[in-house]
């Protein structure tokens, strides 16, 4: 009875939550009765904590509405429900493809004299990219959680997994981390990572060498295929055709696919609608630019790995001024470390100002409140005067709140200074706007997309 009630509760949650929230947090749960208690099994600690924190009140309220005082007790656990557990399957009879940088090779199904056969010696999974050294924050926690679940259960609920976001935000790191996780759990797994251009090149070589059937057999036999920057398939009709059939074959065999792009699937121009539709069959997750706390954590982790003692105030100084992506942060820190090693000077704020003066000057020039206001007004198609006016209609108030939140995140101005720039508003109005937009970014896919697009525009 209670398990049936849980199925009804799932229907309620599916109506109330966004498709991404439902796929991410509710779909992986399994339910089973234990006496008078309904046990919900989550695949890992992250999902368990999130559901218990965000959704337990909704679940309990539904149970009470349906059964009153007879509603079952609720308990959470990690793993699969006992009745669902099955004997471990035999290891996959497949070949792990070594990194091309290593000299070792294993048996192949291709004739290695053929150019296309090079695919047989390339997993390209970088062992240095692990979940343990991926710095997590609000901007990427959904992506990491999804990647962890795929690593634990490849070919399961999130297939395909589609990660999108700007350059240098950690999408590639997560791809490799998943690959390393899969190989750790099953050393025989055939996991292949590549850039989309490499897939195109391999197909062209196969056509030139009359080896297209071998090409098809290879790509359709892998246990997991990870393709970076799928947007480069744009306007390559033959490549899209071949990938379409490869995609279908892998999904039919429950083999994992992970794709990345710099934009939301439906916004990729030059890619067939049937492919874009399939990209959204599993789970689509945005990887956003890191917020201040995450940027600081990235700098501290990188400095620690380099054996450098980076003072907290210096990390905050850099993180507050360089905001666009992880790659830029790491590049800036590498420059600071190199300068410090060369000159023998201690790493202070004044030293960093000098070492990064060109980068800092460029950032300060690019991102101003005025620039943010103009960009947001143009994006939402409202007048600049409306941004500063007292109008409270949603069509004006929401863009104004977005612009205030962006001003807090992307500039070094204080809340009172931001308020002054928006028509002399009080700092509490700015604070409310920032909190409101932060809430909406979790609840509304459209606001989340708008905010990410605006950050990309302002940071480019």
UniProtKB/Swiss-Prot annotation:
Its main location: cytoplasm. Residues 103-123 are annotated as: Disordered. GO terms for biological process: DNA replication initiation; regulation of DNA replication. ATP binds at residues 168, 170-172. Residues 84-123 are annotated as: Domain II. It is found in: Cytoplasm. SMART domains: AAA, Bac_DnaA_C. Transmembrane segments: none annotated. Residues 1-84 are annotated as: Domain I, interacts with DnaA modulators. Residues 341-460 are annotated as: Domain IV, binds dsDNA. Residues 124-340 are annotated as: Domain III, AAA+ region. One of its GO terms (cellular component) is cytoplasm. Pfam families: Bac_DnaA (PF00308), Bac_DnaA_C (PF08299), DnaA_N (PF11638), Hda_lid (PF22688). InterPro entries: AAA+_ATPase, Chromosome_initiator_DnaA, Chromosome_initiator_DnaA-like, Chromosome_initiator_DnaA_CS, DnaA_C, DnaA_dom, DnaA_N_dom, DnaA_N_sf. One of its GO terms (molecular function) is lipid binding. PROSITE patterns: DNAA (PS01008). Keywords: ATP-binding, Cytoplasm, DNA replication, DNA-binding, Lipid-binding, Nucleotide-binding. Belongs to the DnaA family. Domain I is involved in oligomerization and binding regulators, domain II is flexibile and of varying length in different bacteria, domain III forms the AAA+ region, while domain IV binds dsDNA. Oligomerizes as a right-handed, spiral filament on DNA at oriC. Plays an essential role in the initiation and regulation of chromosomal replication. ATP-DnaA binds to the origin of replication (oriC) to initiate formation of the DNA replication initiation complex once per cell cycle. Binds the DnaA box (a 9 base pair repeat at the origin) and separates the double-stranded (ds)DNA. Forms a right-handed helical filament on oriC DNA; dsDNA binds to the exterior of the filament while single-stranded (ss)DNA is stabiized in the filament's interior. This is Chromosomal replication initiator protein DnaA. It comes from Shewanella sp. (strain MR-4).
């Amino acid at each position: 009875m209670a398990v049936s009630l849980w199925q009804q509760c799932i229907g309620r949650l599916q109506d109330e939550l966004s498709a991404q929230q439902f796929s991410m947090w509710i779909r992986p749960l399994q339910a089973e009765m234990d006496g008078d208690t309904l046990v919900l099994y989550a695949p890992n600690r992250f999902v368990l904590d999130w559901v218990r924190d965000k959704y337990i009140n909704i679940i309990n309220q539904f149970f009470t509405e349906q059964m009153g005082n007879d509603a079952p007790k609720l308990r959470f656990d990690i793993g699969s429900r006992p009745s669902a557990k099955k004997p471990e399957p035999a290891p996959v009879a497949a070949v792990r493809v070594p990194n091309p940088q290593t000299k070792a090779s294993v048996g192949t199904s291709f004739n290695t004299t053929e150019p296309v056969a090079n695919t047989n010696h390339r997993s390209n999974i970088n062992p240095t990219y692990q979940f343990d050294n991926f710095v997590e924050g609000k901007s990427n926690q959904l992506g990491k959680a999804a990647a962890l679940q795929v690593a634990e259960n490849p070919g399961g609920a999130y297939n395909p997994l589609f990660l999108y976001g700007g350059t240098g935000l950690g999408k590639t790191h997560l791809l490799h981390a998943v690959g390393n996780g899969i190989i750790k759990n099953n050393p025989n797994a055939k996991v292949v990572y590549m850039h989309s251009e490499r897939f195109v090149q391999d197909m062209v070589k196969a056509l030139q060498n009359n080896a297209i059937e071998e090409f098809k057999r290879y790509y359709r036999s892998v246990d997991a295929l990870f393709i970076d920057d799928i947007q480069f398939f744009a306007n390559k009709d033959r490549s899209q055709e071949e990938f379409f059939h490869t995609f279908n074959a892998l999904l039919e065999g429950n083999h994992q696919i992970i794709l990345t792009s710099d934009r939301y699937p439906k916004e990729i121009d030059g890619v067939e609608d049937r492919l874009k539709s399939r990209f959204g069959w599993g789970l689509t997750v945005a990887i956003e630019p890191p917020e201040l706390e995450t940027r600081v954590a990235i700098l501290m982790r990188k400095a620690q790995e380099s054996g450098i003692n980076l003072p907290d105030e210096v990390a905050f100084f850099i993180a507050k001024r360089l905001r666009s992506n992880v790659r830029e942060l790491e590049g800036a820190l590498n420059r600071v470390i190199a300068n410090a090693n060369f000159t023998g000077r201690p790493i202070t704020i004044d030293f960093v100002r000098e070492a990064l003066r060109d980068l800092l000057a460029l950032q300060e020039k690019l991102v101003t409140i005025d620039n943010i206001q103009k960009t947001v007004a143009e994006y939402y198609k409202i007048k600049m005067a409306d941004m500063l006016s007292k109008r409270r209609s949603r069509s004006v108030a929401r863009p104004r709140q977005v612009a205030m939140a962006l001003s807090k995140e992307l500039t070094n101005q204080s809340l009172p200074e931001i308020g002054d720039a928006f028509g002399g508003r009080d700092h509490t109005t700015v604070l409310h706007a920032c909190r409101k937009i932060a809430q909406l970014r979790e609840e509304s896919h459209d606001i989340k997309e708008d905010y990410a697009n605006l950050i990309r525009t302002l940071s480019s």
